[in-house]
């Protein structure tokens, strides 16, 4: 099967705040595909142009980019125009999932549980937000990943600095109710009715601080896969993950992040349509739990590469 993929581009690097993580993901995917006999080539979208991409002769591409210009629908739209099959979700699902505000609105429309939130701008009276959402609360830029720009606000006096940090990345800032509980994540593979959740992972970071450093570079963070949950709770979390994935129109693969509260109720936090594929990443961990190696996972994702926008039949 590997030879049938033809010449494959592994798109990595890019220009987002998550470039460093993407470089690690891309190199890992590239090595795995080579080991599986795939004619794979690295392509850094932060250093090369779309014209270079069009001229490279790739028959399909594996998107190992994270954040803006790689995970937000812009690249996916360009690949649709170029007619190059690609991994993961299409332009619309990628755009919706990258925007944490729109993600939450879609989930609420589908009756899915997500913490209460407000959208903050320059005219917002910051001192009133904790009265509505409670303390502590979370402030984050809606278009960044890997915990970039996120602050857990403990008191009224922290609001201004937290807002200014998040506003460095976005014109709007997402304020979100803080739910005390266990941090979980669920990988989903496939599309449509065939999409299935992999085993639930629990993340336990030192001091409960699962930040950029603990995500990608620390050996102190603990991961439990499958998570130690009652069978009915694990099944409920997996079902909510599949519904959340479907509600946004995701395809191919993705990862859904949760908080499980003290009553074992899952609360949806974020959708990742191009999750990390580093040595510390969670989708490969979940795949291993069902007997799928890192290389097998990469090949399975690549096998589903496609253009997602369906052109209407021409009327001549």
Swiss-Prot record:
Superkingdom of this protein's organism: Bacteria
InterPro entries registered for this protein in UniProt: ATP-grasp, ATP_grasp_subdomain_1, D-Ala_lig_Van_CS, D_ala_D_ala, Dala_Dala_lig_C, Dala_Dala_lig_N, PreATP-grasp_dom_sf
GO cellular component: cytosol
Molecular-function GO term, any one: metal ion binding
Reactions it catalyzes: 2 D-alanine + ATP = D-alanyl-D-alanine + ADP + phosphate + H(+)
Keyword Ligase: yes
SUPFAM superfamilies: Glutathione synthetase ATP-binding domain-like (SSF56059), PreATP-grasp domain (SSF52440)
Record keywords: ATP-binding, Cell shape, Cell wall biogenesis/degradation, Cytoplasm, Ligase, Magnesium, Manganese, Metal-binding, Nucleotide-binding, Peptidoglycan synthesis
One Pfam family hit: Dala_Dala_lig_N
EC number: 6.3.2.4
Binding sites annotated in the UniProt record for Mg(2+) 1: 257, 270
Pathway membership, UniProt: Cell wall biogenesis; peptidoglycan biosynthesis
Cofactor, free-text remark: Binds 2 magnesium or manganese ions per subunit.
Cellular compartments annotated: Cytoplasm
Domain (ATP-grasp) ranges: 104-303
First-level EC class: ligase
Binding residues for ATP: 130-185
Cofactor section: Mg(2+); Mn(2+)
Positions of disulphide bridges: none
Residues given in the record as Mg(2+) 2 binding sites: 270, 272
Role, per record: Cell wall formation.
Similarity comment: family membership: Belongs to the D-alanine--D-alanine ligase family.
PANTHER family xrefs: D-ALANINE--D-ALANINE LIGASE, D-ALANINE--D-ALANINE LIGASE B
Name of the molecule in the record: D-alanine--D-alanine ligase
Native species: Bordetella parapertussis (strain 12822 / ATCC BAA-587 / NCTC 13253)
Lineage: Bacteria, Pseudomonadati, Pseudomonadota, Betaproteobacteria, Burkholderiales
